[in-house]
Amino acid sequence: MLIKQRKGWEISESRVTPEHMFLNRRAFMGTAAGAAALLSTGAARAEDDPSVGLYPAKLNATYADAGRAVTPLEINRAYNNYYEFGTSKQIYDAAEALSIRPWSVVIDGEVEAPITLAIDDLLKKVQLEERIYRHRCVEAWSMVVPWTGFTLKSLVEMAKPKAEAKFVRFETFNKPEVAVGQQPGLFSSYPWPYVEGLTMAEAMNDLSFLVTGAYGKPLPKSMGSPIRLHLPWKYGFKSIKGIVKIS
């Protein structure tokens, strides 16, 4: 019987990296490198935000550890879903077309005190803090992000919800003239603007966080600026971006 002796430089087939994994890694490394080159540009854009003086905010010690290292900003910016601007993960440039000043948030519905607040007026009424949360995507990837914002509960309480209010509805902007994903095409049948919802109990949970900043600076447009939701116990699609209305 012929027995083949493996040479020292040979490895078994089981140890060979599959082609698709190799190609995906190459694509990821290329994306990360490109994002790193754009990082300084993104920082400059953040400095132009009128709320820049509010950051960084004090870290809330209760939410100082998500059990994993914080994901670098250049990776976060380079791998992000924001379907209003297309299906590519690299939507940071497309999102820059969105103007975030002026920007107002309407709070209405089954409340005793409906209000409409410009984003900068809203920021004057809340206490910003930093929380480190894990962000999980239904696509089977996750990140750890140092978010800055305030509890959803504090905003809901401003509007004084009535006893019959059972749910909270969120609505994003609708600007197809700048948001290419809202234009006729792949998502043309989707009923824009995007909406999400929570039970009142979920909305009043202390974990529910309205985000206006990240990494010690105003929130980048590609991450949902000027205001988005983050729910660390739910998949990312529930954390709606670019909020203009809460009912």
Predicted regions mapped to residue ranges:
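Short, cationic motifs built from Arg/Lys/His that form the positively charged side of catalytic pockets
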Residues: 25-26, 228
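Structured, non-membrane catalytic/scaffold regions adjacent to prosthetic-group chemistry
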Residues: 49-247
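N-terminal export signals
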Residues: 27-48
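Short linear motifs in intrinsically disordered/low-complexity regions
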Residues: 21, 25, 49-50
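Basic/polar N-terminal segments that are highly enriched at the extreme N-terminus
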Residues: 1-8, 42-50
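N-terminal secretory signal peptides
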Residues: 1-23, 34-37
